[in-house]
Amino acid sequence: MQLFDAHMHYSDTHGPAFDAVRERHGVGACTLACIPQMGVCSTVPDALYYKAVHPEGTVYVMGGLERSAWFLHEGDAAALGEDLVAQAGALLAAGCDGIKLLEGKPDIRRNFPIPDFDTPAWEPFWRWAEEQRVPILWHVNDPEEFWDASRINPYAKSEGWFYGPETINNEEQYRQVFAVLACHPGLRLQLAHLFFFSAQLPRLSALLRRYPEVRVDLTPGIELYTNLAGDIPAARAFFE
């Protein structure tokens, strides 16, 4: 079986068009990552329907958390932790195969009161996910140039992805992820977009060696191609 380890975000408008793409390119199985449309509307029901109408073992769904929880339980770590576990359990019971977290994308953290990942509010979720061996597809950070006004590309800037001092720093988010893994080394994490370490392959290699359950996916932004092409021998050695 040939594998390409990437992800796509799913909404109800994608079904027929996605079927055509899968047939054209011979995609036998896929995983749909659910993030809220327009920031708040869940795509989980649509993705589960798509899964239900296709043969077993050909479609998998990573369900997204409800963003209302960040406001409903703001300042109440115990209630939030309990809610996150309940939500995740309900997603699996409904037919999801894992959890999609976009909560590490900096503009999401800028717009929603999401606690730091290594604080008590998240601890019940990480503990549950580790004990239950739940796959988590986690978007953490963005390309490092999004914090540099002189390097960010015009498209990213037009999308609101320039991050100034009011937005969490990428290294601070990496610190939080490393702290979570230090406490929960058995977490089955798949870190999206090569963890935005395509320009730091030795650092990524060290992370993967230390935590055997951690994976990265190859869903590319432009920066991934550019960074890997900047040192082709090193990139080839990493993948080999």
Residues covered by each model-derived region:
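Hydrophobic faces of well-ordered beta-strands that scaffold small-molecule active sites
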Residues: 3-8, 29-33, 59-64, 99-101, ...
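Active-site gating/metal-coordination segments in enzymes
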Residues: 44-161, 166-168, 222-223
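Glycine-enriched alpha-helix->loop->beta-strand junction motifs that scaffold or abut catalytic
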Residues: 25-28, 95-97, 131-135, 183-188, ...
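A short acidic, amphipathic alpha-helical/loop segment
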Residues: 16-21, 46-49, 124, 202-207, ...
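Generic structural signal for hydrophobic
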Residues: 21-22, 91, 129, 180
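An N-terminally biased module of ancient metal coordination in phosphate/nucleic-acid-related enzymes
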Residues: 1-58
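H/E-rich (His + Asp/Glu) clusters that bind or coordinate divalent metals
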Residues: 12, 172-175, 179, 188-240
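Short, surface-exposed connector motifs at secondary-structure boundaries
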Residues: 1-2, 159-162, 183-190
